């Protein structure tokens, strides 16, 4: 996306449209708060999150269909078709909030601000603020989130906007089946700490196992005070006792991409012993990683298997992997997850998709200039729409993910290039010795071990573990 196009869009939007666009993208550029639309779009462009389709989606969301036609040469119907067939840049939650804001008049917003004083405190937000400003403040106080809309629903009822209350209820029903919850901005902003592991980022697993388990299952209501790997940022409020089916032989494909070369044998032996068909690839570039992931995401063999595992070991940045390349940016981690969402990878819809990522973070001084790799999943398009038409994708597209990311300093490899990752060693040991226990429980104990390790070593030797999941059932990596 060129700077000229960004400039044209920014100039054409009015104040309200700019406010809406900034709000819609709060979950997309989570580690920065850009002051204006031009800076926001420029940041997204630099990070590879502003393809023509992405910009078309944003213009569609702010209802500037004239700009779609004049600047992007697309009509409304083409964008709607694109949104049906591709992962969305903007979450359904943000779209819902923006739509509610459009349907409220000034007196409605004033009434909502008044009602919220009981929860926010007086003077927290002025009467002149918009509904979207109010939502942002409520998010900061953890009073509103994608899976926490009861307060807003109650207040809409109190101002007699039953139509908007009903809209929220429909949204809840649409995501309830998936048991999924999204990050709100305040929770997700803690991810900035991953850019500098020494920047006040500590594992908080020194508490008792009972406390950690309560936090893991969402019993605590103050996610900002939790460690990232145990926050409610991407967790359902509870995990039902129902178990994922694990009966296929093999249980599924385990894809190992090791761009360092230290982990392959250990991981292969572990997942083979668990009943997975292991396929491994060594020393790939970031384009090679993207290509392999795209191929595996659309494999029809997934139809016959009950789960999927991907282990990725690479050098990278805080939110991307480089493979063997020397680059400033690389393949964004969120693009990897998008490749395997239910609407892009229909044969794995409703099945657990586990990702274990060891990322050795490289300082910027060691890198060459590059740009983020644009990943749009072309290899999946032909499978995707046909499968959706057959009704394979019946759960929320972001459901059933287990995403475990460990970052460590690149200097660990320089000290001992042949030494495996402590995180992956511990994970392998847990999986082999205690496979009949729930994966979440094993990961909590793994976090505790990493916390103990970090308390004894220097900053450069520490491992920082971050867990997100949207599991709807109990996950045990053993035949049921």
UniProtKB/Swiss-Prot annotation:
Effect of residue 360 to F: Decreases apoptosis-inducing activity. Reduces interaction with caspase-3 and proteolytic processing
Assigned keywords, A-Z: Apoptosis, Host-virus interaction, Repeat
GO molecular function, one term: cysteine-type endopeptidase activity
Region spans: Caspase: 263-358
Tissue: Widely expressed. Higher expression in skeletal muscle, pancreas, heart, kidney, placenta, and peripheral blood leukocytes. Also detected in diverse cell lines. Isoform 8 is predominantly expressed in testis and skeletal muscle.
UniProt-annotated stretches for the region Not proteolytically processed and involved in apoptosis inhibition: 1-435
Region Interaction with CASP8 subunits p18 and p10, residue ranges: 217-480
Region (Interaction with CASP8), start-end ranges: 1-195, 370-480
InterPro entries reported for this sequence: Caspase-like_dom_sf, DEATH-like_dom_sf, DED_dom, Pept_C14_caspase, Pept_C14_p20, Pept_C14A
Subunit annotation: TNFRSF6 stimulation triggers recruitment to the death-inducing signaling complex (DISC) formed by TNFRSF6, FADD and CASP8. A proteolytic fragment (p43) stays associated with the DISC. Also interacts with FADD, CASP8, CASP3, TRAF1, TRAF2 and Bcl-X(L) (in vitro). Interacts with RIPK1. (Microbial infection) Interacts with HBV protein X.
Reported function: Apoptosis regulator protein which may function as a crucial link between cell survival and cell death pathways in mammalian cells. Acts as an inhibitor of TNFRSF6 mediated apoptosis. A proteolytic fragment (p43) is likely retained in the death-inducing signaling complex (DISC) thereby blocking further recruitment and processing of caspase-8 at the complex. Full length and shorter isoforms have been shown either to induce apoptosis or to reduce TNFRSF-triggered apoptosis. Lacks enzymatic (caspase) activity.
Record-given protein name: CASP8 and FADD-like apoptosis regulator
């Amino acid at each position: 996306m060129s700077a000229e196009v960004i400039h044209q869009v920014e100039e054409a939007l009015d104040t309200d449209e700019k406010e809406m666009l900034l709000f819609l993208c709060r979950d997309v550029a989570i580690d920065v708060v850009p002051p204006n639309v031009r800076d926001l779009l420029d940041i997204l462009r630099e990070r590879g999150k502003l393809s023509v389709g992405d910009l078309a989606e944003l213009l569609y969301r702010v209802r500037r269909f004239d700009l779609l036609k004049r600047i992007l040469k697309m009509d409304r119907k083409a964008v709607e078709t694109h949104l049906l067939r591709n992962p969305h840049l903007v979450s359904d939650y943000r779209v819902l909030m923006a739509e509610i804001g459009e349907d409220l008049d000034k007196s409605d917003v004033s009434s909502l601000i008044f009602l919220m004083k009981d929860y926010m405190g007086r003077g927290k937000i002025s009467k002149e603020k918009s509904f979207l400003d109010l939502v942002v403040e409520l998010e900061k106080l953890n009073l509103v989130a994608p899976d926490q809309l009861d307060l807003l629903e109650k207040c809409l009822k109190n101002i007699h906007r039953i139509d908007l209350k009903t809209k929220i209820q429909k949204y809840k029903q649409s995501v309830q089946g998936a048991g999924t919850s999204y990050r709100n901005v305040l929770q997700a902003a803690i991810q900035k700490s991953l850019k500098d592991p020494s920047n006040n980022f500590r594992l908080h697993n020194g508490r008792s196992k009972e406390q950690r388990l309560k936090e893991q299952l969402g019993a605590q209501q103050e996610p900002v005070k939790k460690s990232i790997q145990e926050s409610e940022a991407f967790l359902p409020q509870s995990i039902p006792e129902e178990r994922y089916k694990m009966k296929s032989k093999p249980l599924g494909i385990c894809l190992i991409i090791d761009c360092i070369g230290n982990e392959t044998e250990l991981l292969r032996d572990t997942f083979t012993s668990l009943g997975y068909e292991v396929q491994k690839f060594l020393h790939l570039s970031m384009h090679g990683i993207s290509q392999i992931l795209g191929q595996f995401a659309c494999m029809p063999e997934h139809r016959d298997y009950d789960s999927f595992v991907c282990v990725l070991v690479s050098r990278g940045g805080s939110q991307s992997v480089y493979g063997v390349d020397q680059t400033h940016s690389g393949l964004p981690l969120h693009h990897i997850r998008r490749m395997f969402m239910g609407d892009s990878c229909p044969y794995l819809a409703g099945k657990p998709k586990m990702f274990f990522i060891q990322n050795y973070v490289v300082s910027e001084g060691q890198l060459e200039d590059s740009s983020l790799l644009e990943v749009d999943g072309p290899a999946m398009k032909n499978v995707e729409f046909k499968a959706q038409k057959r009704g394979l994708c019946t759960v929320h597209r972001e459901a059933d993910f287990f995403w475990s990311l460990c970052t460590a300093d690149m200097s660990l490899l320089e000290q001992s290039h042949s030494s495996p990752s402590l995180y992956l060693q511990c994970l392998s040991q847990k999986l082999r010795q205690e496979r009949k226990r729930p994966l979440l429980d094993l990961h909590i104990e793994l976090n505790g071990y990493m916390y103990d390790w970090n308390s004894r070593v220097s900053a450069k030797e520490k491992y920082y573990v971050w867990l997100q999941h949207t599991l709807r059932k109990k996950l045990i990596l053993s035949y049921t």
